[in-house]
Each structure stands twice: as structure tokens, then as C-alpha cells.
Amino acid sequence: MDVILHIGAHRTGTTTFQDYMRRHSEPLAEAGIGYWGPGRTRRGLFSGLVPKPEVAKGRDLRRRAEGRIQLQLTAARARGLKTLLISDENMIGTVRDNIRTGSLYPAIGERMSRFARAFEGQLSTVIFSPRSLELYWSSALSYGIARGHAVPERDKLRGIAQSRRGWRDVITDLACALPEADIRVMPFETYAGRPEVLLEQGAGLEAPRNSERMWLNRAPTLADLRRVLADRGSEGSVLPFGMGRWNPFTPEENAALRETYADDMMWLHAGADGMATLTEDQTRTRAGKILPAGPQTEGQGNELDERQVARPG
């Protein structure tokens, strides 16, 4: 049985993809394709695989987690599944950690090496979606405020914009942790709101027709953020005037973030040093120009803390 991981990144349409997979789980199962999403992985399946500081010493929770995963994989094979797709962006880290460190998934290598051991060489493919950095960070910071974070200070924003860590570094760490896996990079700008295309071109599987076009868990707008701040007694005037998407960066910072992303994409187009494959939708002549209707914001309500249980639905 092949195991395929869909690992985000956060803020790239993961909730929409997971909803699509959940709604079509029956026809996929009939075709020998199983699906595990956050509703399963965050209810104890992965607990202990990545250690937390508060865990008592001497308890080998990692080995227990590996055994638990292996039991579930054995059960999936016994049901006749040929492929298992697992989608959970918290495997690579959390938005909370990204905001705290001002960096993109600084622990992705260590985390994914633990998942590699848990799946014992059964991983065939990893699907990863980057997003233009100024939009990624704007979305992440907006959702952070909605989940209790303070509005970031200028020094924090400047540090994020000046960070040298881009998606190239994230993908390099991922490839080092999973040297045997086929890493397929599918940019948000091309595949946003098109989960069936992501499944077909990322996993190489025949995808059920998606009759319900939805864009789930959008990031909060400026108006939403003002209400959030007012509800907790904070001053909403720290945010700029307007009703649409919040962009906290200066024009110079936006330019720096766009330049880093352009360098990342150039590296991917050049072959990514053999570490990953940039998957491009041949039905589109120009990526990133046609997106689903509605605000270009995306999010997952429980992505900031991987200890939370995914909402049903």
C-alpha cells in the first residue's frame, strides 16, 4: 500500500481539500483509495510522535505512536486499500510556531524524519503547496490575531520580511528528512480551490468530480479583525482603514517577500537540485491568474495549535 502525504503548507487551501476528500471518501474507497484527515490524525493517532516540552521523561511515547500508526496501516491494507492519502498540515509544524519564530517551519526536518520512521519506508509521495510569501504571512498573521495573538509590532514584521528562510529552505529540509519520497510542489496560485485537480496531478489518482465549489475557512478581513480586537478590549485603530484583506507590510517589505518567493520559484523551475518536482497544470498557460471567486484568503480554524481536535463537518 502506498502512503501519500498532503502536508500543506497552512493557508494554502488545505481545509477545502480535506473537505473534498471527506465528501468523496466512499467512491474513493471503492477505488481502493483511503483517506485520513485531521478528524482522525488529531484525535490521538499522532500523539507522542513529536515530543512536547511538558511530556514526562522516561515515557517512550514515540514508540507507542509508531506502533499505533502501524496497526492502523495494517488495518487499512486488510480492507484492500491500495493507496492511503493522509492530509494534515500540522505534520510540518504550526502557524503558531511560525509566528513565534518569525520563520517558515523551522523544525520541519526533525518532525518529518519522525513521520518517515513511523511509516517505515511506505511513503511514496509528498504533496506540498507554497504560497507567495507576502500573502502567506498576511493570512497567517490575520488568523493569528483571530486566535488570540497580539497585532505584531513593526520590528516583528520587519524581521519576517528580512528573513532569509524561504520555501526553498523548507523544501530542502523536507527532502533531507524524506530522501526516498517523491516530493511534488503544487503552488497555491495554481491549485487554490481546485481539490480534484490537486488530487489528480499531485497524487496521480483519478479524482471524483467536484460538484460543490467551496472556499472554506477564509482568513478574517480587516472588519473581522476589528471586531475581534473590540471583543477582547483592544484598540482596533492599530489596523489600517478598509474592509478587505489586511496586509501588514510596507511596500518595501512586500517587495522583499515577493523577491524571495520569485527566487524560490526560479529554483523549482530549474529542477530544485533534484530534491522536488514542480507540478504545473498544463491546462493553464499562466499560473496564478485565475482563482476561484471570493476573497483570496484561506485558513484553518484549528491550525495554530496541533493539540486541538478538528471540527467535524
Where are these regions (language model features)?
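Anion-recognition interface
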Residues: 1-313
